């Protein structure tokens, strides 16, 4: 469904998410820990920005072809090895940020690199995944999310560990950001590109 960031919500519903066994017959420890909090999740939705998929009331729609093509374009620009088949995987997430209890992720490519200040920075993996719901507040036994960005396609680029001073790390982030903007296929603006440093 077409995501539009909205501040007005005409629909509200609640859920309790529980840890369940995976296809391998095991329960994810992080999911089990989260389920011990016994939170009731309250979701706010606007029909302009979310549909029954985001409410987990109908099956997921087909993969967004434009998002897949953008992930392939970025993978090529980073000289990554693109897989001949892309499969949808499910990551268990029961903190309430996803109504289904899992996030859909696709491993698109591995390897590759970018040049920064004359040094080669390796790429570990490139994934296409979906964004989570936006946390509004967490109080007592309730957690509140808006669904206006749930399911928005994201390209996740994991780089090799980097050694260097903070300026070099900043230069890597700037170089990667510029590469993404050159595609003219990614959202621009504050908060549209998120970069985590671990």
Regions found by a protein language model. Give the residues of each.
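Basic, nucleic-acid-interacting segments
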Residues: 1-198
């Amino acid at each position: 469904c077409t995501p539009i960031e909205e501040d007005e919500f005409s629909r509200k519903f609640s859920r309790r998410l529980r840890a369940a066994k995976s296809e391998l017959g095991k329960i994810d420890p992080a999911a089990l820990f989260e389920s011990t909090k016994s939170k009731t999740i309250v979701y706010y939705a606007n029909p302009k920005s979310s549909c029954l998929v985001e409410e987990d009331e109908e099956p997921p729609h087909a993969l967004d072809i434009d998002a897949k093509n953008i992930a392939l374009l970025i993978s090529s620009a980073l000289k990554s090895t693109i897989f001949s088949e892309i499969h949808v995987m499910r990551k268990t997430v029961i903190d309430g940020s996803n109504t289904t209890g899992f996030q859909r992720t696709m491993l698109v490519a591995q390897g590759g690199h970018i040049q920064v200040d004359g040094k080669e920075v390796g790429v570990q993996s490139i994934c296409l995944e979906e964004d989570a719901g936006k946390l509004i507040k967490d109080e007592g036994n309730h957690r509140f999310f808006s669904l206006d960005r749930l399911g928005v396609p994201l390209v996740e680029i994991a780089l090799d560990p980097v050694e260097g001073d903070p300026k070099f790390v900043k230069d890597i982030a700037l170089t990667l950001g510029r590469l993404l903007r050159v595609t003219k296929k990614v959202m621009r603006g504050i908060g549209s590109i998120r970069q985590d440093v671990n």
